[in-house]
UniProtKB/Swiss-Prot annotation:
The gene is rps7. GO terms for cellular component: small ribosomal subunit. One of its GO terms (molecular function) is structural constituent of ribosome. Keywords: Ribonucleoprotein, Ribosomal protein, RNA-binding, rRNA-binding. The keyword RNA-binding applies. This is Small ribosomal subunit protein uS7. Belongs to the universal ribosomal protein uS7 family. InterPro entries: Ribosomal_uS7 (IPR000235), Ribosomal_uS7_arc (IPR026018), Ribosomal_uS7_dom (IPR023798), Ribosomal_uS7_dom_sf (IPR036823), Ribosomal_uS7_euk/arc (IPR005716).
Length: 215
């Protein structure tokens, strides 16, 4: 007779992200973002791209994994960010998920040490404060182009916030001794506190200010 699973395998009582941080007490205050921030308990935030071909499938990807995926981005290539073209500057983690995984884990440890809070909760606050509610789009009428203010969908708000958090970390550690993990931790903490030093928070304010002037 086969032994039960609890005797054959080690099954933890509570699944924690990176084996350290629980998501049970993590709250999302923004009602529009709440359905799109996946916080199901898991040890390893890696979905193996199962949702890649499903419409809106990325809404089911764990929020920490989505941050890891943004950390792997190559940086701005066709425009300057922070006054620099940063493409290939972070080649050591471009498309290398395990390295990005370790970077985010180290950043979370720094956040926990500095804030004495659950770093996942701090990340959620940073996302809520960095997600623009309004943006502008270009429309053509009578051969003339106009800028018009539009509402931003919740999924795009989440995408923009994560992208700017990762990009802000890249700017902070551009050609200096600050490691990417340290820069990422500083960016997340600053965005969570609505600090103007945060690139993501400042970018959100800029986007909404331009949209307001285009009404």
């Amino acid at each position: 007779m086969a032994k039960p699973l609890t005797e054959r395998f080690f099954i933890p009582k509570e699944l924690k992200v990176f084996g350290r941080w629980s998501v049970e007490d993590v709250t999302v205050n923004d009602p529009s973002l709440r359905p799109y921030i996946a916080l199901e308990p898991r040890i390893l935030p890696h979905s193996h791209g199962r949702h890649a071909k499903k419409p809106f499938g990325k809404a089911q990807v764990h929020i920490v994994e989505r941050l890891i995926n943004k950390v792997m981005r190559s940086g701005a290539s066709h425009y300057k960010a922070g006054g620099h073209f940063m493409r290939r500057e972070h080649r050591s983690i471009m498309s290398k998920k395990m390295k990005a995984y370790e970077v985010v884990k180290e950043a979370f440890m720094i956040i926990e040490r500095r804030t004495k809070q659950n770093p996942i909760q701090v990340l959620i606050r940073a996302i809520e404060n960095s997600a623009p509610r309004e943006d502008t789009t270009t429309i053509a009428f009578g051969g003339i182009r106009y800028h018009m203010a539009v509402d931003v969908s919740p999924l795009r708000r989440l995408d923009v916030a994560l992208k700017n958090i990762a990009l802000g970390a890249s700017i902070k550690c551009y050609r200096n001794k600050t490691t990417y993990a340290q820069a990422l931790a500083e960016e997340i903490i600053a965005a969570a506190n609505r600090d103007p030093k945060s690139f993501a928070y400042s970018k959100k304010e800029e986007i909404e200010r331009i949209a307001q002037s285009s009404r």
